[in-house]
């Protein structure tokens, strides 16, 4: 049997049933890193300001539709389609959707698992 899992985004389980957080890692059976699809409309203000200090995970966000502002401490970073942003484990972060909302892929893993230059 081939060790491949293929899912359409519409097949992913939604946290809370509202379609904002989709469990991509769980749906695909990924065990080596975290992965979620996150979709927020304009004006969505409930994205938590948080860190991953306790679990030691850095996160990478990839915006594929819409736009957002990544608030990290006292700094803000504009995220447009095609933009990647990496946030270290201890850094506070919050996603604020742009005027047309945002759809992004969030990846998480523990630093040091891979070489940075590979």
Predicted stretch roles:
Residues 56-69, 73:
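Glycine- and acidic-residue-biased ligand/ion/polar-headgroup-sensing regions
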Residues 48, 70-71, 87, 93-99:
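Short beta-strand His + acidic residue motifs that chelate non-heme Fe in jelly-roll/DSBH
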Residues 36-55:
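Conserved short histidine dyad/triad with adjacent acidic residue
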Residues 94-118:
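Double-stranded beta-helix
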Residues 74-89:
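Short acidic-glycine-tyrosine-enriched beta hairpin
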Residues 29-31, 71-75, 98:
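Short strand-coil-strand connectors
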Residues 36-38, 61, 105:
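Conserved hydrophobic/aromatic positions in well-ordered beta-strands
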Residues 1-34, 41, 115-118:
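A short, N-terminal "cap"/entry segment at the start of jelly-roll beta-barrel domains
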